[in-house]
Amino acid sequence: MASVFRSEEMCLSQVFLQVEAAYCCVAELGELGLVQFKDLNANVNSFQRKFVNEVRRCESLERILRFLEDEMQNEILIQVPEKDAETPLPREMITLETTLEKLEGELQEANQSHQALKKSFLELTELKYLLKKTQDFFETETNLGEDFFVEDTSGLLELRTIPAFMTGKLGFTAGVINRERMASFERLLWRVCRGNVYLKFSEMDTLLEDPVTKEEIKKNIFIIFYQGEQLRLKIKKICDGFRATIYPCPEHAAERREMLTSVNVRLEDLITVITQTESHRQRLLQEAAANWHSWVIKVQKMKAVYHVLNMCNIDVTQQCIIAEIWFPVADTRHIKKALEQGMELSGSSMIPIMTEVETKTDPPTFNRTNKFTAGFQNIVDAYGVGSYREINPAPYTIITFPFLFAVMFGDCGHGMVMLMAALWMVLNERHLLAQKSTNEMWNIFFNGRYLILLMGIFSIYTGLIYNDCFSKSFNIFGSSWSVQPMFRNGTWNTHIVENSPYLQLDPAIPGVYSGNPYPFGIDPIWNLASNKLTFLNSYKMKMSVILGIAHMIFGVILSLFNHIYFRRTLNIILQFIPEMIFMLSLFGYLVFMIIFKWCRYDAHTSRKAPSILIHFIGMFLFDYDDSSNAPLYGHQQEVQTFFVIIALVSVPWMLLIKPFVLRAKHQKSQLQSFTIHEDAVEGDHSGHSSKKTAGAHGMKDGHEEEFNFGDIFVHQAIHTIEYCLGCISNTASYLRLWALSLAHAELSEVLWTMVMSIGLRLQGWAGLVGVFIIFAVFAVLTVAILLVMEGLSAFLHALRLHWVEFQNKFYEGAGSKFSPFSFKHVLEGTAEE
């Protein structure tokens, strides 16, 4: 259980694996996900490592799998097995390569054949429609005989629409062009040929499919009449430029009919072949879809294992692989078991050897988390990963973070909406996780679902404390205030009530205030009071100061546990104790004055209540001459003077003593080292040269343990100044709890007054319809402004209060994160490089 509050104890071990068993052992460790491999080849180029060829083969397989995925996209549904595939053995890579390369080759061949057949189908379809349209043209537009194109121009004028100036033998060109190019094609043809051609075109009713892009295309059929070889060449060049397809079209009607019949027969045969080819392609895709997910997992696992093996060393005999691993000490038994399973799986007889390695390198920091605590741990780690074995703020953040958020966000109505949203994500988390969404914004909210859940719960709690629900109050227990005694004793009468814009209740009059406060939260009568804001400002401001100082004192107390764990006795005496004295004597005393004033003065004596602010300022100035501000209690001057003096004493206590103690310790250790060297020299009979050598070694050792008093003193001075000034600035920083709570309450009230109350005031049928419309607007604005914008603002401020005001009292955050080799992280794409 101690690991919850402090990072896991880590161990660095050297593992000796037989080359044949290394792959299986690493794969078993990847399934376990509790081992971080140390890169022993950091200075070696990635292309010069031992298993680079295997990694390239895996990348080649990944390329094939991406090709298969692209082919299956929008055509075949990829089947996802219930259980992930096991890590394949090294020898299975050859089988997998053969299978995938064969499938890729067959699919590429099928695609090429299918594309070629589709292209032929497109050309034949275009030719079919061209022959039909050409025949229709000759039948409707001309009365020419079969010898029209052979004889001279004696019958030319029988073509009704051909210009009369065209004489001589006529030729024609027929083809197909994309519809969007038709207008430009016609204009260019007219200009280049200077009007000496006759163009006739018609739109194809059938949509065609591009064999390459598979997009639908619209085309026009055209026929151009011309005279002379030069015009024919010009027309051909223009058609080529506009990517128009020219088809041979017989001059005689019988030949055209015969060609059309032949084209129809070829189209029928082609459709049969295309159907068979598509059926074969679909069978290949079905085979790929059934195994694609398993293949991807196998390849990713193999590639990850070889990447890890590239981080290991191979001994000179090429028979043993040496790896260095970080792992939690508590999981040693599981890791040894995984290595033994890998050895058995590989068929090796050599048991992997683990030997602990002594190192001065700081171990990585590993904090165990579950789906509930992971979000809070991420908040802490976003500021900085904790130093090894220092106390972990995350368990305390689970409570303090949503609570401080709720203090700023406090509204039980808004908290209820937030709670319902979080509950929906929590209750449907399995279904939502299975969808594996790639939307970054959604993933941020979903990963923080338990954080949002607690923020909603705490917001409901603080909302009930504030008695605030969508800016309105609940009157569950009945108010503790009554107006009847004001009439009974004659303070109020009908005339006063009718002529006074404001009436003030006097709690000093018996019966006006019952003496028993509202059982839970703020009395609902304050919702009617004109001085509601004044009362709430005072209440929330003092509450913010109390919560802030308590939060900071808790942070300082946590630093004590760090000092005790790391056995820093000097830090306890010369750092923790003066820090606590400084904090408690000044700011702890401020909290005492606030609570004491609340308890000391009631309705009858409140007029004589002194100002805490003036007392606190006078405490630092030693100014007690203000007779208008009565003391809170007897001997207040002596008590406050004592607190200021011990606070001032704690500053040099923190600043001066520790550097000088460290200096004295260093000088003592140097003296002991020098004495040892002197004794060794006296016992040596090697003469003066030996003394010189010993002296040289002594100087060298002293250099290695260099002690810089100036650096230590400057560091301690910075820490002291930062802490003392930080106590003041951090206390002021907690006033954001008051400011944001006030802003949220006022925005909520404005939204209710300017939107929802309008709908509630509407009368008749208009009110019946209008209230639904206005409520929709109110709901949208509430979610957008108060829940999203205000919620994000309160979240960021709570984040700052934890990162700066709380964690800087005890948290170093200078560690490195434990990044274990885990197939789960590899498959999720969250593995760190």
UniProtKB/Swiss-Prot annotation:
Description of how the protein assembles with itself and partners: V-ATPase is a heteromultimeric enzyme made up of two complexes: the ATP-hydrolytic V1 complex and the proton translocation V0 complex. The V1 complex consists of three catalytic AB heterodimers that form a heterohexamer, three peripheral stalks each consisting of EG heterodimers, one central rotor including subunits D and F, and the regulatory subunits C and H. The proton translocation complex V0 consists of the proton transport subunit a, a ring of proteolipid subunits c9c'', rotary subunit d, subunits e and f, and the accessory subunits ATP6AP1/Ac45 and ATP6AP2/PRR.
Organism phylogeny: Eukaryota, Metazoa, Chordata, Craniata, Vertebrata
Ranges of the Vacuolar topological domain: 410-411, 474-538, 598-642, 746-766
Tissue specificity: Specifically expressed in kidney, but not in the heart, brain, spleen, lung, liver, muscle, or testis. Distribution within the kidney appears more widespread than that seen in man. High intensity staining at the surface of intercalated cells, with additional expression in the proximal tubule.
Residues spanning the membrane: 391-409, 412-428, 444-473, 539-558, 577-597, 643-662, 721-745, 767-805
Localisation per UniProt entry: Apical cell membrane; Basolateral cell membrane
Topological relation to the membrane, as annotated: Multi-pass membrane protein
Organism, scientific name: Mus musculus
Residue ranges, annotated region (Disordered): 681-700
Keyword Cell membrane appears in the UniProt entry: yes
Name of the featured protein: V-type proton ATPase 116 kDa subunit a 4
GO molecular function: ATPase binding; P-type proton-exporting transporter activity; proton-transporting ATPase activity, rotational mechanism
InterPro entries assigned: V-ATPase_116kDa_su (IPR002490), V-type_ATPase_116kDa_su_euka (IPR026028)
